[in-house]
Amino acid sequence: MQRILIVEDEQKTGRYLQQGLVEEGYQADLFNNGRDGLGAASKGQYDLIILDVMLPFLDGWQIISALRESGHEEPVLFLTAKDNVRDKVKGLELGADDYLIKPFDFTELVARVRTLLRRARSQAATVCTIADMTVDMVRRTVIRSGKKIHLTGKEYVLLELLLQRTGEVLPRSLISSLVWNMNFDSDTNVIDVAVRRLRSKIDDDFEPKLIHTVRGAGYVLEIREE
């Protein structure tokens, strides 16, 4: 089930959106202020974000700026009463994918949501995002918290393997076979050294940590709750 985040401070509008999207078959979470909305969005667990501009604590402009600067590429639909052209242009230039004016027709909103989700799915095969890290499989680029990370060829292949099997514990023998095309030798620490070097680049200076050791089993890439 696809997950949609709604950040809307008007309670009636927020509940209406949430209920309507749930009835359309989506999982919809609602937050009524910018601070909590950004916190939820930063976890990278949503397929689409519906965002108001005028919000308590942090406004919509600040939220989308923070998300895009940290590498988040989830589609964002602004839903707002700010209807002048200058505001529309500002939203799109900050990285929004669509902009819908209040009052709105719910059927039009759903159509726009479906279009954005289809577009995102077509890009998903080449771009993977977990937490604040984005990996472009075509360009072979890695960005975490807005910072470009330089990897060697083998480090990139190792990261791509872990990404493609997020949440799955990969034994050293499998990593050895798929990344180095060789049988695993228990007397060598090649795999451990490679993982340690990869961790130093994508985990040491960032939170949350993404690569974890499962003692006696192998390695896994996942977001773990504190």
Swiss-Prot record:
One Gene Ontology cellular component: protein-DNA complex
GO biological processes: regulation of DNA-templated transcription
Gene Ontology MF terms in the entry: phosphorelay response regulator activity; transcription cis-regulatory region binding
Broad class of where this protein is predominantly found: cytoplasm
Keywords: Activator, Copper, Cytoplasm, DNA-binding, Phosphoprotein, Plasmid, Transcription, Transcription regulation, Two-component regulatory system
Segment forming the signal sequence: none
Miscellaneous note of the record: Transcriptional regulation studies were performed in E.coli K12.
Function description: Probable member of a two-component regulatory system PcoS/PcoR. May be involved in the activation of copper resistance gene operon pcoABCD by binding to a specific site on the cop operon promoter (copper box).
Stated name of the protein: Transcriptional regulatory protein PcoR
Organism: Escherichia coli
Higher taxonomy: Bacteria, Pseudomonadati, Pseudomonadota, Gammaproteobacteria, Enterobacterales
